């Protein structure tokens, strides 16, 4: 089964992202707006128990995660993905590193660029038009996230939460 690890921003940021995603993101119906910490990976039931134990340990050692969303950006020319840029910080960077070492060892497929995708799979002309409009908009959100999530992929391609890990040693509410 496929799993992934993400942060979900507040409803305010999700609503803002979804106002674009519903028009420009082919994955709009498959997963809410999120910040990917670990891209999809395969695991079996036995590995899953060990992983959740390790994720609880990582969460207990991780402070609340400050998030600052500052602008629209793009991965062009690598891909036509348009996203909300999330500023890198020490907490995010350390959490990402922990999710790619030890039990989760493995070189990440991509360099860690924290972001919330708002557009993907756009044809060249549409991508250029949309990006030229959004890149001029002022964007500023700041918040602190107190949990990350282990997701799994359903047969229809959508993602759902398998477990939630509250950071800072708090219990899941």
From Swiss-Prot:
Gene Ontology MF terms: hydrolase activity, acting on ester bonds
Protein name: Putative phosphoesterase GTNG_0743
Enzyme Commission number(s) from the entry: 3.1.-.-
Listed InterPro entries: 2H_phosphoesterase_YjcG-like (IPR050580), Cyclic_Pdiesterase (IPR009097), YjcG (IPR022932)
UniProt record similarity statement: Belongs to the 2H phosphoesterase superfamily. YjcG family.
Renumbered ranges of motif HXTX 2: 115-118
Domain of life according to the entry: Bacteria
Motif (HXTX 1): 34-37
Keyword field contains Hydrolase: yes
The protein's enzyme class: hydrolase
Keywords from the UniProt entry: Hydrolase
Disulfide bonds: none
Active site: 34, 115
Pfam family, one: 2_5_RNA_ligase2
HAMAP family: 2H_phosphoesterase_YjcG
Keyword Hydrolase applies: yes
